[in-house]
UniProtKB/Swiss-Prot annotation:
<feature type="disulfide bond">
    <location>
        <begin position="1392"/>
        <end position="1513"/>
    </location>
</feature>
<feature type="glycosylation site" description="N-linked (GlcNAc...) asparagine">
    <location>
        <position position="1301"/>
    </location>
</feature>
<keyword id="KW-0964">Secreted</keyword>
<feature type="domain" description="VWFD">
    <location>
        <begin position="1390"/>
        <end position="1550"/>
    </location>
</feature>
<protein>
    <recommendedName>
        <fullName>Hemolymph clottable protein</fullName>
    </recommendedName>
</protein>
<dbReference type="GO" id="GO:0005576">
    <property type="term" value="C:extracellular region"/>
</dbReference>
<comment type="subunit">
    <text>Homodimer; disulfide-linked. Also exists as oligomers.</text>
</comment>
<dbReference type="InterPro" id="IPR001747">
    <property type="entry name" value="Vitellogenin_N"/>
</dbReference>
<feature type="compositionally biased region" description="Low complexity">
    <location>
        <begin position="198"/>
        <end position="231"/>
    </location>
</feature>
<keyword id="KW-0353">Hemolymph clotting</keyword>
<dbReference type="InterPro" id="IPR011030">
    <property type="entry name" value="Lipovitellin_superhlx_dom"/>
</dbReference>
<dbReference type="InterPro" id="IPR001846">
    <property type="entry name" value="VWF_type-D"/>
</dbReference>
<feature type="glycosylation site" description="N-linked (GlcNAc...) asparagine">
    <location>
        <position position="459"/>
    </location>
</feature>
<dbReference type="InterPro" id="IPR050733">
    <property type="entry name" value="Vitellogenin/Apolipophorin"/>
</dbReference>
<comment type="function">
    <text>Forms stable clots in the presence of calcium.</text>
</comment>
<keyword id="KW-1015">Disulfide bond</keyword>
<feature type="glycosylation site" description="N-linked (GlcNAc...) asparagine">
    <location>
        <position position="106"/>
    </location>
</feature>
Amino acid sequence: MKALILLLLGACQALQPGLEYQYRYSARVASGIPSINRQFAAAGIQADVTVQMAADYSVVVQFSNIEVGDLNKVLDCDLRAPLPIEYHPLEDYVDLLEKPFRVIMNESHVPSYMEGPEEPIWISNVRKGFVNIFRVPLFWSTELHSTKLNYGAVEETLVGRCQNWYTSMKLPVNLAEEVNVQREHFMEEDIQRDAYSSSYTTKTKSKTSSKTSSKTSSKTSSKTSKTGKTSPGQLANVPHIEDTLWSVRRTTDFDMCENLVSLQIHSSKYTEDIIQRSSVASYLIRGDTHRRIEQVVVEGTITVLTNKEQHEHVDTFTNQTLELKAVREVGEPITVTYDVHPHYDWQYDIERPQGDQFIPLEQVLTGRPVTDQIVNSIMEYIKKTVDDLSHRMEHYPAKPENLAYIIGRLVEAVANLDYPYIQTLYTHFDGKGTMQKYIFVQLVIHAGTEPAVNFAVDNLSDILFYVTFYESIGVSLRTPAPIPKIMHSLINGEEGLHHSLGLMNFATLAHDACLSEDRKHFYFDYSCGPKTTCDPELIITNFIPYLVRELGNQGKDVWQRLIYLQALSNLGTPQTINVLKPIILGVTETNIFMRTNAIWSLSAYNMHKTALSQIYEILMPIIENKGEQFEIRNIAFLTLATWGPGHAWWQQLAVSTWHDPSPQFANFVTTTIYSISDSHTKLAETVSRIKHLCKPAAPASILHSTNFFLHEYLFSEEHGSRVNFAWFASVHGAIPEEVFLRIQREFFYGYTKVLKIDGQQRGLYNLMQLMKQKMTKPQKRPQSSAQEIVSGMWEELKEKIGFTSPESASDATLWLKLDRLIYVALQYHFMEGAPIPYGMYSGKPFYDKDLNTLIAFPTEIGIPFSVLYVAEDATWLNINGNPETSMTSGKMKVNVDFIFETSQVQFVDARAHVPWSKRPAVASGVYADTQLVLPLNVHASFDMYSQEIQLSIEPTNTQKIDVIKFEFIPYTVLENNYPGDVLVIENEYKPILHGEVPLFNDKHQAFPSDVGLWIQVATEGDIHHTPSIYEIITQLFSAHTSTHIWEQSIVFDPTLSTTKTVSFTFNYVSTGGSGSLVDRGDYDDGQISQGSFDEDFGQFSQVAGGSDQDIMEVDSFGTQSQTIERIMRLQQALISSGGHVRTISVEVELQGTPTRNYEASLTWAISSSASTRSSKVQVTLIKHPAVGVLEDPYTICLNAQIVKPHFNPFFTTEDVLTANYHSTVKAELFEGETCEEAPVLLLEASFDVSSNVKERVKEAIEKGCDYSTYAPGIDIITSPLYDHSHITATWTPDFPDNLKNITYYVDDIIKASLSKKIEFDHTSAHHASRVEIDATKCIETGLWTVRTEKPYAVSIINELELPAWANPIFTPAPLATTLLYGLTVGRTPVSCTIDETKVRTADGKVFAYEPSECWNAMTLDTTFDQRGAMLVRNTGQWEVRIIWQKEGLVIDMSPTNFLVNGEPAKGTDNRYTVLHHDDSHTIVFESGTSVKVSDKVEVLLGLDHRGHTTGICGNFDGEPSNDMVGPKGCYYTDGPLFALSWASPGEGCASFMYKNLKRDVVWYQENCPHFTYEPTGVTHADALYDCTEWVYHQRTEGQYHCKALSPMPVCRPECVASHPITTSVEYECRFSGHQQQAQQQQQQQVQGTQWEECFPHFYTLTYPSSCIPQ
């Protein structure tokens, strides 16, 4: 028969009544990073423990001789050796800890509960940690049955109910002999074995052993039993114990635990991966019939991962040892004489508050009280530190501590104070000054405890609290207790900016703490009650109705209602779906902002997974409704895609892209599918299988809605991108209408923050145009008579066609959603000379916490372990006085003197709390911080008309300072403070080094001595790493931790710097052929000389004057700019060759002793002939002589000329196929005092297209596969056709060595990166000063073979694949054309074409057309500016009339004539350029708009007309469905009738003829359909009906009463359920426990403390996927 035998507290055979067992017990904890070094912070406790079994089988235990100790140092090599802790007697709490306690057994002799004195909880936990060693169940068999050697058991442990695995093996005889010898040396007395010496396995004892045992036994006996050693005759009743020795191993499986005891604040669902635990106990047990524990070693490990590098972690080790010293008869029973306090479970206890009592967090964990003395020291610390902080800016340039760290520790100090103490400090600082009070208010707000939050809410009348409290409640709040009070303050508060932010922030907080299925990660301490949990009903019955009421108030502005909508969205609960549904479907709201935000609130990242079916039912009709705006359909598709739907859904959407009427929707769907397919995610496996079904997407461009890895599930290390974005193209301009941006930051492993930015705009492009006009110098207007005539023609045209221009400019609206908070900017009003908002710079520190996570749980030894993850930052901009500003026409000056400081701190602190010690915790961790300090005087001047910016920077510090400082420090520490995060006494952090000193140390100057700035870069650490400038900049924005110590500082010393001020001058100079500083167009033999389609297409238009221009002023504040004069002289050499010359220059002046000046400029000019286009580029680097120093200037110039084929803006395919593609590059490098000497380097290159490539292109066009677009010609010239290149570089002996070394460096990089593809031939020598490169591309593979002939070698690179960014270089078209065609218009032609049978609009709509002699409006400006219109007619030849109302011009053009205001064009005009050929005229405007008249009419509109035009060419908004809209808003399906609606009379089209043609149009307009987008809820009213309700399911399972954490759908009575879904649902379960526990809970409730044990459990649940009306 098998029996369950519990050793010690498990069965009566284990401990014998009448006997006393004495053990030596020790417990130790050590923390460090052993992967770096053997350095540990450790603490230990050891004691003698006496255990007596009474006759009623209750057990009494008593500690004595208690000693404690600690250490913090590098250990010896053997990490398994005992810790060299120097122990000393325990001083505090020794009387309590040495009091005996009792363990009560139940009727089955199983331990039931423990009784002890009223004592701090940490002492009770230490007792439990000791008792739990003995709670070991073992399965044995009798002699008739085999032993079960391995088994598992679910047991209640100190950490929770866990699966323990046991292995028990009898020791072999030889090993048992050795163990017996060791045990006999240690035992002082053993009455069970002495009484039966004949049964000893070891027949004789050594003398030493006998003597030692006798002495120690006598000594111990005199203290306890007072009997001495007894003869066998006197021990007749002592049970015999066999010498059989058993080895028992117990391993705890933490993955199979339930009811885990822990305390979590702002934790993560990745906690189980971040923190890994293990526990292994090894037992030595003696006996068969009767047993006893001889020796126990319990070893625990806690591993905390610090970042994504799995090998970087902090380790904490716990160790318990128990060794039997003596077994003797009970001489004097240990009695319990106090009133006992029962402990009904064996789990770790935390200290719970009584009623409204406030207990600091560390006291909750440990039970060690925070005394009044400690509180007083904390308050003094806060007073002193806040006072010092308020004067911080006055002490620069002293080396300060990290600002974020100082404020962070002050926040933790306030977090340990109760309400009265906070009130006392508030009163104190209120009388000290505004700065001190402001700082303290920030501390209270960020403390986030219940007293702090209650105090902040009670003082919202104080403006300092009101303006900042609501902005930080999401991260700072540490407990759900104050949530009801915050909610009521918002509901009853007055509307305003801060109230709006509060609503949205609180909604996010309510989601995280009350409504989310993961809300236990916000706060969890395994209890239920109003102090520790947030009831969802609080939000559902109070906050949601408030938001719904305010949202439905149509009297509020859209932006106000949008705030309430966003708050509902932030709640992220299905209970809001029925509220949002009418908005989503467009029934109660038509505003696109409201609808898109409402739809996005249904994303998988924001809504419970059980809502999928209902969301699918709402959004799929929107996606399929072709009458919806494409933005609405896009966001509906995007929202459903976040739910990761199946293959069939993706297939349906992919196929729909071929026949969807909206190119914007189709393109967005395709790019989304492409982006997911190319990612390394699980969803990619599904989506990639239907990628081939999509209509090919246009390249990513601003005119096509595109998704570039938007979704959070596409964040992937393998994909290599943490910046993801998407956008919806605008129908009202070139700027996308909505932009989604996601930037991911990873703080630690499993803890990331995604910065979510959603921007929506209307009219922003128009606003930018207005700003550009204001930045342009006013120029001469046309003569009034011409203006009046043209204006009259414009008004007459509008009257004839029945078009009305808007009377006012459209509003510019910008909505910016930043991390679920909506900000709004409205109107043009800020353009009307609004003052600079100095008030936004308060001159006070700003503190923010991105992460503040605490995870705590017990260790086996009964003390708590906690992990703290912190990421915090602080910024302080202190402006000395008021900035000096001056503004005149087009010019502005600013002078400001300030100190700017910003800092970041990140650390992981793994802490074992040691409540018995004066060093309250041992800890190890990793710390990282970043600091930037800039004490500067900045002077800036902006000359908008001359396009010059001057910026001077002067450091104002007078002593050496660390401008930038980075630190990465792994450490161990014995903490001095309690609570540990309040640094009343500075801790002695001991860095963990690989050796005795850092392995790497370097100091060097950042700049050469000529610069005159003493800036030292000092680096030391255990890794050899010199970060790049990019790394330094990124570190300022995103710190990270490392287990390698590393420190770098950039130090500036003004006393050693000869340069005192650094000035920058930025210039842009544009010069026409005559030398005037304006954009000019040259009428050069009928060819384009500038402003061509290739160069200027897509640029913004400018308000220019007439043809007779004045030279623009180029002075800066009354003084002629020497830089601009120098640039003008530089441009003269290029102007003589014709063309438009532009220069961008940067000048740096180092003002000091001496003053030095450096200049860099880029100049380029472009000119064209009939067949070629020439681009000249000059790059100049100048080092001017220092002031007062006799030295020569030094100049480097690179002159290059690039010749490519030239193409007319409206070229034909035949023009492209017959063009000469030969392109050349010639470059010369000059070096010396000037650029007038002989070049030191000459480079010549040619690029060609082989006949094979041309043949392939022709075949592709004939087949219509690869070039199937409407305009194959532009596709061809913007494709990388060049397949051969030859480059020759020749240098002279004067070629400078430094440049030569750069070429060697580049050559080495190429050799290293292409080592597997490169071959060398060193057998022959070549020209000593020349390199020749010959490259050929394989047409089949697209790979290049590059042969390079060097002076002493020939290298051949095979199968070289060029990166995608290099492809534009190998296109026949100019680089600007290639980029604009690809990135702006997405390789989709946007020209409008009119011939004798049809019209193709700019958006691709084709309809029948019957030309006549009446004018038809091709394009007509619909903006408030009323720029004009383009008319077309056919009088035997095509004629175009351009009415440019704004400029007072009427341009008439035909294939043979070109007139301006009725007269032949003369001279030049900078506003346009004219091309004349035998059978055509082409006009190219500066804005990029082009019109060609030949045997057809072609119009190419500039981007500033996007969505702002109408006529027979459509509205140029990217959507062809709305192109056929007439001047009165009628929608036409008949092409000729549509064209007639835009007709107006003219020569050859008399009034009678005109009226006859317009008769059908007039009749149609009387009762015509208008084009409108029809929301789904309007066209399908039944879509509003919903059958679903949401409830929180409840159930009882055994001793648990559970409530689901997620609301589940149920059908209303009038509906039936379909397709039930069974899934695993997480519940919050209240544990009823044993009877004694229930009684204890009743007693607590009487005392005012309401809490019950609550743990998460998973159960399966079935719910309907959808509900259908009966």
